[in-house]
């Protein structure tokens, strides 16, 4: 098990692009490999990280019960707030240590030891993005950097890598460097201005994102 003690799975979104499936269930509970997207995510994380926290919003009561049954340590209701609200407004804001952050629609295989080693090598920045090579059919935020210091993030200009939805961040340090951000994009740009946003040289061993029912069906044909 890595020395990273905390992970956050962001799972509060409505999953509009997966309607009508998400009319009755929240997106994180979409069926995957005999279980659900978020149950598999929690199970994988639990092999490496002892404390797993989940943000919920849409159909929050249903999802909260599900993730607690799956072993989540705590649940934060962020309904009506931005995706980075929890960084500034929950007990996690005081953590002065690396926290692994993922989104519920990422299916990923990570080498946590390598990732943590890379974070230490970069002098434990306020935030380190974990990138992937662009995948055809999946939109993303392209990352531009100079010696791993991020200089720009763009959805228009293309680069060799884009955000995977995975990052390692230090909540207390972010609160010291930034004012409360409207979303992660705003948070990142505040960090860029301070020279405090880094990008990892370690990529996920396997990675896929689920934005549509078609992508979910495709992933279920060859799960990992």
Which residue ranges define each predicted feature?
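Conserved N-terminal catalytic core of the sugar/cofactor nucleotidyltransferase
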Residues: 1-9, 17, 31, 35-114
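A structural signal for short hydrophobic beta-strand segments in well-ordered beta-sheet cores
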Residues: 29, 142-145, 200
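A short, conserved acidic/glycine-rich loop-to-beta-strand motif
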Residues: 122-132
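Short alpha-helical oligomerization interface
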Residues: 23-28
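Acidic-glycine-rich active-site phosphate/pyrophosphate-binding loop
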Residues: 65-69, 140-150
């Amino acid at each position: 098990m890595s020395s990273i003690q905390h992970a956050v799975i962001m799972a509060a979104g409505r999953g509009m692009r997966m309607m009508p499936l998400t009319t009755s269930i929240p997106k994180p509970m979409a069926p995957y490999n005999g279980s659900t997207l978020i149950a598999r995510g929690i199970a994988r994380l639990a092999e490496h990280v002892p404390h797993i926290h989940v943000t919920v919003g849409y159909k929050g009561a249903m999802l909260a019960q599900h993730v607690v049954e799956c072993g989540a340590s705590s649940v934060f209701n962020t309904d009506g707030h931005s995706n980075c609200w929890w960084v500034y407004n929950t007990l996690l804001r005081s953590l002065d240590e690396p926290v692994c952050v993922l989104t519920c629609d990422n299916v990923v295989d990570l080498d946590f030891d390598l990732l943590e080693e890379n974070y230490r090598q970069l002098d434990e920045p306020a935030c380190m993005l974990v990138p992937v090579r662009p995948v055809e059919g999946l939109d993303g935020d392209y990352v531009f950097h100079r010696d791993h210091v991020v200089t720009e993030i763009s959805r228009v200009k293309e680069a060799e890598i884009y955000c995977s939805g995975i990052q390692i961040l230090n909540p207390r340090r972010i609160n010291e460097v930034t004012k409360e951000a409207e979303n992660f994009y705003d948070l990142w740009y505040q960090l860029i201005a301070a020279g405090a946003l880094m990008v990892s040289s370690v990529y996920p061993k396997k990675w896929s994102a689920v934005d549509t029912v078609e992508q979910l069906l495709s992933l279920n044909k060859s799960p990992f």
